Swiss-Prot record:
Belongs to the TPP enzyme family. MenD subfamily. The lineage of its organism: Bacteria, Pseudomonadati, Pseudomonadota, Gammaproteobacteria, Vibrionales. This is 2-succinyl-5-enolpyruvyl-6-hydroxy-3-cyclohexene-1-carboxylate synthase. The gene is menD. Catalyzes the thiamine diphosphate-dependent decarboxylation of 2-oxoglutarate and the subsequent addition of the resulting succinic semialdehyde-thiamine pyrophosphate anion to isochorismate to yield 2-succinyl-5-enolpyruvyl-6-hydroxy-3-cyclohexene-1-carboxylate (SEPHCHC). Pfam families: TPP_enzyme_C, TPP_enzyme_M_2, TPP_enzyme_N. Homodimer. Binds 1 thiamine pyrophosphate per subunit. GO terms for molecular function: 2-succinyl-5-enolpyruvyl-6-hydroxy-3-cyclohexene-1-carboxylic-acid synthase activity; magnesium ion binding; manganese ion binding; thiamine pyrophosphate binding. It catalyses: isochorismate + 2-oxoglutarate + H(+) = 5-enolpyruvoyl-6-hydroxy-2-succinyl-cyclohex-3-ene-1-carboxylate + CO2.
Length: 564
């Protein structure tokens, strides 16, 4: 048998992708490159894998993040060697905080070409540090290393991911040649060493893990509890609402839940002493899901627990979500499973906090008076649920997501965010991944600075068919800094950084439709009309004065704070 390194490279990659498929991978995101040839060709050859391509590795990582976020499956990412690998770090860091399962397949030079001046070769081992839950540095493909070893080694990494979530890194050093027309059958005896695995269709080395179940909560029926719903699926949010209604408890809904309640606007009314005092009568807080937007809710929660209130946290993610380091009972299990056990018997509800909905209603009433039906961020947040309709919603990390947290009321909207590191990068790409995984129409709300940061990824929408509306709220820079105690002399130059740009020609560059409405009525007509009759992507630019949103928020807070 003549040695053909290119064929051997592809045999290893074929084996790798088949095992990834058996672990649940269905989508593979691929960037161009020569060293990654065996990975790209074998991903393409696997008939049950769907490929997504992008020329920008940073955007590619976020595209994969969105796919994983929406599909709840691991997603593979293929890049070539060198700085292509380093560009994945922002998305990997986000996944490390929010739990999406990315499988990073990074092509590399063989070890003898690293650290010696060879082209496009950097130190890739350990490049993602503790942002990944496990790493595997493969040897260069060779017949002295068995395919059995390859499978058990890959399985160990993927089982670790199954338990803890987050990204894993498999570094793949491929010697040249990278191209060959020879058939794989020239190594048939080597391939046949795992023939039984190929025929049976299961994971090569399986692990069974017990499912943790929640403890009984019969003893808490008579307690005054508050239910907090964080970043969860819409179905989980609905189950949590049913549970709270059954128990007679108030519900505080983060916008990431896609739901609202009679206690909405809490980020504002928690500033009112009477409202805060009533909510503080609770003796148990049950939080479903991670990553709350409201800093004020975090502060109230911290004060309550420090005063002796019990704090339960339900999330399948083993990682802690406890930024104040409070005493906490963490139920590491499926939210749906926990709720199914808890709600399987009759209880006698003990309703309380009945005065708080009055404050919520006042927040909504006053917000509408302040906005005065004008085209502003507060008015858009108030009408967001009707704008999105039956489409999915992606909220960026600008001032607007906080506005939604303060005054928005989402009535059963599947909502997605990147609220791990809460970066302003990769939001176009992440939203594209979510939309591809779900195949639903989508409304994306993004700030102008975030949009500038990820302009490359508008290319992902160039051939969009399903209706997508991208709303860029353009307040000319970082208006959020109006809400922070930054030095006023340097606020504009060092924090807000006004740019003066508009996005019409960015839309044209990537073949997207574009409108810039001047009234709330026109905005509504454009968005609703595109979802009803349009196709592809529509970029809607909403220009607002730089300090308008922050002034509206301060007006609203001042009014509600003074209520008695």
């Amino acid at each position: 048998m003549n040695h053909d390194q290119a064929v051997l490279n592809r045999i290893w990659c074929e084996t790798l992708f088949e095992e990834l498929y058996r672990f649940g991978v269905r989508d593979v995101c691929v960037a161009p490159g020569s060293r990654s040839t065996p990975l790209a060709l074998e991903a393409n050859a696997h008939t049950s894998l769907k490929l997504h391509t992008h020329f920008d590795e940073r955007g590619l990582g976020f595209l994969a993040l969105g796919l994983a976020k929406a599909s709840q499956r691991p997603v593979a990412v293929v890049v070539t060697s060198g700085t292509a690998v380093a560009n994945l770090l922002p998305a990997v860091a986000e996944a490390g905080l929010t739990g999406e399962k990315l499988v990073l397949l990074t092509a590399d030079r063989p070890i003898e070409l690293v650290g010696c001046g060879a082209n496009q070769a950097i130190a890739q081992q350990g490049i993602f540090s503790n942002h990944v839950c496990a790493s595997l540095n493969l040897p260069s493909p060779n017949t002295q290393t068995s395919l059995n070893w390859l499978l058990t080694s890959v399985d160990q990494v993927l089982h670790q991911q199954a338990v803890s979530g987050h990204a894993v890194h498999i570094n793949c050093p491929f010697p040249e040649p990278l191209y060959s027309n020879a058939p794989k059958s020239i190594y048939q005896s080597y391939i046949d060493t795992v023939a039984v695995w190929r025929a049976e269709g299961g994971i090569y080395s399986n692990k069974q893990m017990p499912l943790p179940m929640p403890t009984s909560i019969a003893e808490i029926e008579q307690r005054k509890a508050v239910v907090v719903i964080g970043s969860v699926t819409l179905q989980e949010a609905k189950q949590a609402h049913q549970f709270a209604a059954q128990m007679g408890w108030p519900v505080l809904c983060d916008p990431q839940s896609g739901t609202t309640s009679d206690w909405s606007g809490f980020d504002i009314w928690l500033q009112n002493p009477a409202a805060r005092a009533q909510l503080s009568q609770c003796d148990l807080i049950i939080q479903f899901g991670r990553r709350l937007v409201s800093k004020r809710l975090h502060q109230w929660l911290e004060q309550q627990v420090q005063a002796g209130c019990d704090y339960w946290y339900v999330s399948p993610d083993f990682e802690r979500d406890n930024q104040s380091h409070l005493p906490q009972q963490h139920f590491v299990c499926s939210i749906a499973a926990w709720l199914n056990v808890v709600t399987n018997r009759e209880v006698q509800p003990v309703a309380w906090a009945n005065e708080l909905p009055r404050f919520s209603a006042e927040v909504n009433k006053q917000a509408r008076e302040i906005a005065q039906s004008s085209l502003c961020e507060m008015m858009i947040a108030l009408h967001l649920s009707s704008l999105v309709g039956s489409a999915d919603l992606f909220l960026g990390n600008s001032l607007f997501v906080r506005m939604v947290d303060m005054v928005g009321q989402l009535h059963g909207v599947e909502t997605f965010t990147n609220r791990g590191a809460s970066g302003i990068d990769g939001l176009f790409a992440t939203a594209s991944g979510v939309q591809r995984a779900r195949s639903n129409p989508m409304l994306l709300m993004i700030g102008d600075t975030s949009a500038l940061y990820d302009l490359n990824s508008l290319a992902l929408y160039s051939h969009q068919e399903t209706p997508v509306v991208i709303v860029v709220t353009n307040n000319d820079g970082g208006a959020i800094f109006d809400l922070l105690p930054v030095p006023p002399q340097q606020k504009q130059a060092l924090y807000q950084m006004p740019h003066g740009y508009r996005f019409e020609f960015a839309a044209k560059q990537f073949g997207l439709d574009y409108v810039r409405p001047t009234s709330m009525t026109e905005l509504t007509e454009r968005i609703v009309g595109h979802f009803a009759h349009g196709c592809g992507a529509l970029l809607v630019e909403v220009n607002t004065p730089p300090n308008q949103a922050s002034q509206h928020i301060k007006q609203l807070a001042d009014h509600v704070r003074a209520l008695v």
